[in-house]
Amino acid sequence: MKDLNKTIGVFVRPTHHQNALFKELEQAKEWVLTLLEDEGFESFMIDSLDGAKDAQLIKKAYAFLCLGGDGTILGALRMTHAHNKPCFGVRIGNLGFLSAVELNGLKDFLQDLKQNRIKLEEHLALEGRIGNTSFYAINEIVIAKKKALGVLDIKACAGHTPFNTYKGDGLIIATPLGSTAYNLSAHGPIVHALSQSYILTPLCDFSLTQRPLVLGAEFCLSFCAHEDALVVIDGQATYDLKANQPLYIQKSPTTTKLLQKNSRDYFKVLKEKLLWGESPNKKR
């Protein structure tokens, strides 16, 4: 079979051998490859985060099956983002907020995929730039202190207009899809995953008046820190940000693409995965 629409890349995070679920992942990987063949799909494995190195291989796939948790899906989405390829997650692990299906439901999902009974969700992604270095973020870009002590001053601009100076441990710039990740842990708002906006949430801000801010995605943002800082991408990659060096962030021209069941409902996922609106005493 040479049909591009029948070719699925299987992504397992390259550090999975360090995972407590290593044995389960290895067994699941072999089972998944066999199932794909039985269902009439061509498949290949990718266990690297180097999208440039695997560019030709990535182009061969219609979509990518991400075997693991949300971290695995985030890594795959960044790796394939420039190639405009959709991904879907098969959960092995704990939360699985982004996952499309459990392992025991994969066969039905693949059959629905063949019959075009799967929906494609397109989400806003961030494109960041420091000097000549560009990168994509699916959940968030974080500007964080390099030093354990002291306060980091971050000047924020929308276009050429300064609108705030944050003084604290740092700043989260999240996507709506990422609003339920680090942003939520830092007491930022939940924003519907299909919205077109940025969420700016300060980390341990020095001022009582600072609150999270939601901005329309039409803005091009820039940030400067008064001293050397770290820029963290989806909690997985880091870049150095020199004092007074601008970090530019804008809406990526390419969307984050996730394949999901037609029956998936965002509010239901919030309730099931995060116990949204439930009593704190309710047992899962």
From Swiss-Prot:
Residues at the catalytic site: D70 (proton acceptor)
GO cellular component entries: cytoplasm
Reaction it catalyzes: NAD(+) + ATP = ADP + NADP(+) + H(+)
One BP annotation, GO: NAD metabolic process
EC annotation from Swiss-Prot or TrEMBL: 2.7.1.23
Domain of life, per lineage: Bacteria
Alphabetical keyword list: ATP-binding, Cytoplasm, Kinase, NAD, NADP, Nucleotide-binding, Transferase
Subcellular localization(s) per the UniProt record: Cytoplasm
Keyword DNA-binding attributed: no
Cofactor requirement: a divalent metal cation
Keyword NADP: yes
A Pfam family the protein falls into: NAD_kinase
Residues given in the record as NAD(+) binding sites: D70, G71, N139, E140, K167, D169, L177, T180, A181, Y182, N183, L184, S185, Q236
GO MF annotation, one: metal ion binding
Family: Belongs to the NAD kinase family.
Role according to the record: Involved in the regulation of the intracellular balance of NAD and NADP, and is a key enzyme in the biosynthesis of NADP. Catalyzes specifically the phosphorylation on 2'-hydroxyl of the adenosine moiety of NAD to yield NADP.
Name of the protein in its database record: NAD kinase
Lineage, uppermost ranks: Bacteria, Pseudomonadati, Campylobacterota, Epsilonproteobacteria, Campylobacterales
